[in-house]
């Protein structure tokens, strides 16, 4: 792999603007090369051959002996009221042919390197601050452990060694710095003023971040103080250790990213200078790299020292001195693409295609669509099986989302908060999707075969139960507690789903409202689940020809309620965020879902009770809800249609290089949001059953949601890039009274 591609692939996506602009520097080198080629061609046409050879030999000898193509100076600049060191390169041969391009090259390189050096210095300063916070947290943990452990313990020095290790880390890190002021500051920060456990316990309180009950959630909303008095129990000790373990892991990841950032940028400067020397026939790389090696970016060993100490402390005190176990937490293995996954995905895909073809042939050969029971089958069995079709389609769309997020470097695993090493790739999702699709198609074919075969008519009851068996199997797999079939992802999904259902009582994070939005596109799937309950719960499956669900008052009532539930949950999430964040924009977002609730209810009412009044009312509210929702999708969720941006009617930053993709997505979003017109216009096609039409409209909504997913996360990613937000904030378990709450917010 060429360095340019490797450089981009190893970037931290949220920090991409803070890296050396390697691609732009290469374009300047191309200008230098073109200029020198023109100069050489002019010299060749005007200089005799013998004289030209002598001149070329003389210039080559001069290049070897002359090392003063550039002079690198250190200057002091005032930025935001602070004096910072910067580097300026003076090109000494600007008067030569093409010298203006070389001046531009060094000016750009200096600007890029100073940007990188200052950014790295700022992040190291932040790491120092976090090291201080973790040091104080460890002091509190030591004191807390003493209190929990047996009071008659004679040898507490085992626990005290943790604080000594961290303090020693601070001293060693400080001594490695080239800046004396930083040495003193870091040593002062990391040194405990009072090592007395009792005095520490007097100055700390526990920060409770878990919202287990509605009462704790209400206290959070009302801004009741979240600090509890210290209760020296083993449960609290386990909770503190767990949260500190997460904090150390996250801090370690930050340090690794910083180390990688330093190495990549130094390598980029080295590569670009070697290219410059080769193209311009200069000898400037050695002198410039001497400056780079002496800069803070390359000379500071603080990050390396902290990495070693964090490893030592974590292994000793969070992994029982088991290095392999400790490093498995600090450096989790990256999921590797296995050939078995690819093979299995292709196998299930082939099986699915074959089963679809077989299904079509059976329907045609046996003339199932022309049989008297076709209408009854479409009103009973089809709503049961189409649930799996909706799920499979949504999983396929999500797999496509993952593929394009990875292709355009959208850090979806960080945005969703997936644990490193457990996130699913698009191949894994497709494997599950095609597997479920194959299983569902097998059930459909088995059902049809048993229905049409005279020898199995005595087992009609078993035939009717096949969809229920399939649903129960899927539920068992999702709830399976064993570590099979991506347990971490299944449990993550279930936890997010639970928080969606309990929306008012839990803080709302991006995965919560993202899943809530997915549910709003699965209304027909939820109605299929309702039909499962009615069809099997009330015994209609025993007498298929006597389907009483559609005429049941309770079923018709819940037919309304089920369509409203996803939008109502999203509305509650918006209200919770508005109250918690004191941000009215969440309230305006809630209005969108409230309008959709009214519009969906009116359309459902019109479907069940035809009439001009219902039709007109459904038209009006559906139109308003569609306009409001489309505006919110495109302008706020996607961040498009910005005024004064360099990309007309889009935004300044675009990850997809083709603008037509964004324009097409906006048009498709509008068109697919208008699928409700089929309901109010009462469109019918002779070759399509009404249930088939409903299923097609639901599939179009799922596809629209997939398009929305990509651009929604793209916009979220670009917001993180603008704020250089590449790490999650980990709440610490203890709060020191003199520090205030801001350390843990």
Curated annotation (Swiss-Prot):
Domain EXS: 550-744
Cell compartments where the protein resides: Cell membrane
Stretches in topological domain Extracellular: 364-383, 449-464, 637-660
Keyword Membrane belongs to the record: yes
Positions of the SPX domain: 1-290
Tissue-by-tissue expression: Expressed in root epidermis and cortex, leaf hydathodes, pollen grains and stigma apex.
Primary localization: membrane
GO cellular component, one term: cytosol
Membrane-protein topology: Multi-pass membrane protein
Cytoplasmic side: 1-342, 405-427, 486-615, 682-745
Annotated keywords: Cell membrane, Membrane, Phosphate transport, Transmembrane, Transmembrane helix, Transport
Induction comment: Not induced by Pi deficiency.
Any single biological process term in GO: phosphate ion transport
Pfam families: EXS, SPX
InterPro entries named in the record: EXS_C (IPR004342), PHO1_SPX (IPR034092), SPX_dom (IPR004331)
Membrane spanning residue stretches: 343-363, 384-404, 428-448, 465-485, 616-636, 661-681
Entry similarity comment: Belongs to the SYG1 (TC 2.A.94) family.
Free-text function comment from the UniProt entry: May transport inorganic phosphate (Pi).
Protein name: Phosphate transporter PHO1 homolog 4
Source organism: Arabidopsis thaliana (Mouse-ear cress)
Taxonomic path: Eukaryota, Viridiplantae, Streptophyta, Embryophyta, Tracheophyta
């Amino acid at each position: 792999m060429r360095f340019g591609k490797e450089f981009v692939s190893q970037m931290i996506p949220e920090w991409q603007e803070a890296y050396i602009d390697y691609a732009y520097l290469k374009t300047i080198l191309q200008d230098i090369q073109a200029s020198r080629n023109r100069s050489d061609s002019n010299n060749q046409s005007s200089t005799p051959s013998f004289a030209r050879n002598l001149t070329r030999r003389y210039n080559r000898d001069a290049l070897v002996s002359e090392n003063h193509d550039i002079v690198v100076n250190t200057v002091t600049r005032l930025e935001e009221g602070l004096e910072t060191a910067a580097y300026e390169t003076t090109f000494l041969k600007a008067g030569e042919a093409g010298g203006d391009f070389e001046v531009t090259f060094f000016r750009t390189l200096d600007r890029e390197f100073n940007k990188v050096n200052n950014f790295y210095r700022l992040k190291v300063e932040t790491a120092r601050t976090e090291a201080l916070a973790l040091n104080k947290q460890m002091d509190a943990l030591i004191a807390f452990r003493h209190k929990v452990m047996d009071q008659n313990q004679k040898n507490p020095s085992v626990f005290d060694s943790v604080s000594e290790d961290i303090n020693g880390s601070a001293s060693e890190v400080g001594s490695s710095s080239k800046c004396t002021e930083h040495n003193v500051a870091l040593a002062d920060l990391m040194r405990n003023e009072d090592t007395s456990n009792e005095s520490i316990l007097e100055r700390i309180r526990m920060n409770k971040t878990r919202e287990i009950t509605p009462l704790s959630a209400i206290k959070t909303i009302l801004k009741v103080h979240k600090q509890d008095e210290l209760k020296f129990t083993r449960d609290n000790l386990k909770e503190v250790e767990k949260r500190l373990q997460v904090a150390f892991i996250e801090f370690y990841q930050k340090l690794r990213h910083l180390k990688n950032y330093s190495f990549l940028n130094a390598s980029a400067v080295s590569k670009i200078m070697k290219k410059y020397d080769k193209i311009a026939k200069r000898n400037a790389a050695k002198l410039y790299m001497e400056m780079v090696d002496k800069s803070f970016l390359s000379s500071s060993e603080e990050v390396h020292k902290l990495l070693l100490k964090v490893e030592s402390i974590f292994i000793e005190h969070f992994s029982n001195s088991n290095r392999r176990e400790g490093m498995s937490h600090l450096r989790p293995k990256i999921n590797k693409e296995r050939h078995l996954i690819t093979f299995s995905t292709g196998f299930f895909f082939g099986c699915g295609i074959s089963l679809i073809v077989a299904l079509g042939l059976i329907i045609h050969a046996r003339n199932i669509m022309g049989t008297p029971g076709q209408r009854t089958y479409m009103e009973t069995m089809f709503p049961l099986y189409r649930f799996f079709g909706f799920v499979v389609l949504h999983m396929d769309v999500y797999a496509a989302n993952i593929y394009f997020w990875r292709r355009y470097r959208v850090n979806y695993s960080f945005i969703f908060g997936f644990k490193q090493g457990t996130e699913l790739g698009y191949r894994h999702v497709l494997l599950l999707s095609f597997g479920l699709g194959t299983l569902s198609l097998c059930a459909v074919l088995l059902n049809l075969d048993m229905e049409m075969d005279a020898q199995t008519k005595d087992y009609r009851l078993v035939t009717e139960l096949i969809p229920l068996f399939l649903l129960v199997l899927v539920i068992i797999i999702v709830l399976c507690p064993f570590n099979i079939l991506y347990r971490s992802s299944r449990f993550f999904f279930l936890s997010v789903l639970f928080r969606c259902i309990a929306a008012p009582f839990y803080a709302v994070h991006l995965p919560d409202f993202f899943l809530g939005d997915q549910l709003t596109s699965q209304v027909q799937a939820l109605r299929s689940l309702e039909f499962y309950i009615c069809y099997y719960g009330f015994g209609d499956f025993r007498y298929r020809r006597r389907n009483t669900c559609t005429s049941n008052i309770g079923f018709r009532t819940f037919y309304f309620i089920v369509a409203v539930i996803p939008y109502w949950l999203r509305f509650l999430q918006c209200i919770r965020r508005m109250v918690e964040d004191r941000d009215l924009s969440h309230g305006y977002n809630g209005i969108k879902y409230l309008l959709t609730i009214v519009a969906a209810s009116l359309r459902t009412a019109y479907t069940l009770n035809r009439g001009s009044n219902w039709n007109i009312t459904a038209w009006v509210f559906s139109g308003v809800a569609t306009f409001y929702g489309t505006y919110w999708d495109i302008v706020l969720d996607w961040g498009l249609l910005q005024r004064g941006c360099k990309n007309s009617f889009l935004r300044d930053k675009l990850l997809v290089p083709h603008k037509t993709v964004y324009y097409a997505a906006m048009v498709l979003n509008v068109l697919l949001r208008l699928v409700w017109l089929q309901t109010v216009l009462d469109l019918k096609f002779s070759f399509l059953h009404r249930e088939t039409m409903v299923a097609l409209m639901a599939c179009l909504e799922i596809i629209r949601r997939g398009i929305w997913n990509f651009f929604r996360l793209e916009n979220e990613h670009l917001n993180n890039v603008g704020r250089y937000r590449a790490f999650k904030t980990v709440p610490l378990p203890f709060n020191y009274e003199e520090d205030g709450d801001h350390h843990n917010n």
